[in-house]
Design a protein with these regions (language model features):
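Short, glycine-/aromatic-enriched active-site segment of Class I SAM-dependent methyltransferases
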Residues: 149, 162-175
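Conserved class I S-adenosyl-L-methionine
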Residues: 130-160
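Class I SAM-dependent methyltransferase Rossmann-like catalytic core
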Residues: 1-36
Length: 231
């Protein structure tokens, strides 16, 4: 990979940081509005980092599940966070009722092929009636991982060419991009049939959010918000 291409990636992530912070903050505010966590709500965060919970003032009890060496365990926070190493597609040590809400932000597209994604979804539904699963939209002009415009619309040979060039300089990063499997709205609905599907907009469709509101952390019945999108 040329120095220019390497710098392009570094610059992309640097420029995206404030934008990502803005979008995640808005997304978490929507999460609070819809899911209504209270002080001490028990949340299972699949594949997440503690930094996203900095947007939430309410002290929560959070379990973050990640592959070994991924979680930022030294992050200082006002939440009660436990870090667990594990596979989000197979969590035999957890059972229904252990958590009030299952949460995941931009993870399901990284777990593997459609079969692995279905396993992920089954674990979500097995563990709670209340969940919030977000994944990027194919239609957003700038792909969130590679920084390439309209990445998912390139012919496969073109994506393969770019990946082969990138892998010479950044093999780990390239593997992450190469193994990302974008999810369409209809597929997300198939995986999580009881969910409401929310489209997050930033001029273009930015991401999809599948959420279900079954029982509140206090145990009372709640009805889901009738929201199709926010801008």
């Amino acid at each position: 990979m040329s120095l220019f291409k390497y710098l392009r990636i570094k610059i992309f992530y640097t420029l995206m940081r404030p934008f990502s912070t803005l979008v995640r903050g808005a997304r978490i505010r929507l999460f609070i509005k819809i899911m209504r966590p209270v002080h001490g709500t028990k949340i299972l965060d699949l594949g997440g980092q503690p930094t996203i919970w900095d947007f939430v003032d309410i002290p929560l009890v959070i379990t973050c599940v990640n592959l070994p060496g991924i979680a930022m365990i030294d992050h200082q926070t006002h939440h009660d966070i436990t870090y667990v190493e594990g596979d989000a597609c197979h969590l035999p040590n957890f059972k229904f009722g252990d958590f009030d809400i299952v949460f995941s932000n931009s993870v399901i597209e990284h777990v593997g092929n459609s079969g692995k994604q279905m396993q992920f979804a089954h674990e979500v539904m097995r563990l709670s009636n209340n969940y919030w699963i977000q994944t990027p939209c194919k239609e957003f002009p700038i792909e969130a991982h590679s920084g390439m415009p309209f990445w998912w619309y390139y012919p496969s040979w073109m994506r393969t060419y770019f990946l082969s060039q990138w892998s010479k300089k950044l093999p780990g990063w390239t593997e992450m991009v190469a193994t990302t499997t974008v999810i369409q709205k209809r597929d997300l609905k198939t995986m999580l049939p009881n969910a409401q599907i929310l489209t997050e907009w930033f001029i273009f469709p930015k991401s999809l959010i599948a959420y279900s509101v079954g029982n509140s952390p206090q145990g009372s019945e709640r009805q889901p918000y009738k929201i199709n999108a926010y801008r």
